[in-house]
Amino acid sequence: MPTPYRVLRSVACDADIEAIFDHLFQSYRDLGDPTTDALTRAAARVRGIEDALAALGDVPFQGPMPPDILPGIRPVPRDGAVYYYIADETLSELRVLAVFFGGQDHRNHILRRILSGAGPQG
């Protein structure tokens, strides 16, 4: 079995995960969950997202490479989230550029992020 790629998270990816947590927490509160329950549920969901993100390194070349976004970028959906990443075969690394959740227009979000200069390092 091949060695998994090291998974690196961009600053934007970390911000995405924080925003997902905030969104989930507020949604659970709006639906009537007590604060502690909403925190617990949001944290559990985000742990699942982070686990799926880490597992991307096990199969780094999954998903299509849309030619009109950024060379080498791959969007991969998992359990309600879409992960955008670039795998570097030479370094055996996978850089996660973004994580979008739910019904977001993730394609337009990643295009705006790239055009704003966030690029692969952002």
Task: Enumerate the language-model features and the residues they cover.
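Arg/Lys-rich, positively charged N-terminal/basic patches that mediate binding to nucleic acids
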Residues: 1-46, 122
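GIY-YIG nuclease signature motif recognition
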Residues: 13, 49, 85
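Conserved protein kinase catalytic domain
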Residues: 21, 50-53, 100
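Short, flexible helix/strand-to-coil boundary loops that buttress conserved ligand/catalytic motifs
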Residues: 21-24, 60, 110
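Generic structural signal for secondary-structure transition and capping sites
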Residues: 29, 54, 58-61, 81, ...
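A short, surface-exposed loop/turn module that caps and links secondary-structure elements
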Residues: 50-77
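Enriched for short, Lys/Arg-rich terminal
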Residues: 73-76, 81-122
